[in-house]
Every structure is written in structure tokens, then in C-alpha cells.
Swiss-Prot record:
It comes from the Eukaryota. The keyword Disulfide bond applies. InterPro entries: Prot_inh_I78 (IPR021719). One of its GO terms (molecular function) is serine-type endopeptidase inhibitor activity. The keyword rRNA-binding does not apply. Keywords: Disulfide bond, Protease inhibitor, Secreted, Serine protease inhibitor. It is found in: Secreted. GO terms for cellular component: extracellular region. Disulfide bonds join 5-67. This is Elastase inhibitor AFLEI.
Length: 68
């Protein structure tokens, strides 16, 4: 659901930036699918409004989130 994704992207940006991405974080989120983007990952360019993209750094810490 795109509305759920947007709500969760805002939550991640407000509450989880700098936190490690863990199974507990993944299980707490309702968006489906969730794509975790690591530095250097190749990504596909198709737009899926309900997909939550969580960007992490080399230490697996959350640095950004958006829907696409």
C-alpha cells in the first residue's frame, strides 16, 4: 500500500536514522516489499509505489528511506 509506505518512510527518517538495520526493524515495518540498499548495490529502476527502500551505510546503519 503506497500510503503505508509513505508513512513508514517518514517514521524511518524521523526515528531510525543512525540505527542499525536489524531483523527487529524489518519485522516492525508493515511495508511490502522492503528493499535494503547497501553502498555499491546495483538497483533496478522500476517504480513500485508500495516498496520501502531503506538505504544503509557500510556499518549497516540506516541513512535514508523512501518509497519507489
Amino acid at each position: 500500500d503506497p500510503a503505508t509506505c509513505e508513512k513508514e518512510a517518514q517514521f524511518v527518517k524521523q526515528e531510525l536514522i543512525g540505527q542499525p538495520y536489524t531483523d527487529a526493524v524489518a519485522n516492525a515495518l508493515q511495508s511490502n516489499p522492503i528493499r535494503v540498499l547497501h553502498p555499491g548495490d546495483m538497483i533496478t529502476m522500476e517504480y513500485i509505489a508500495s516498496r520501502l527502500n531503506i538505504q544503509v551505510n557500510e556499518n549497516n546503519e540506516i541513512i535514508s528511506a523512501h518509497c519507489a
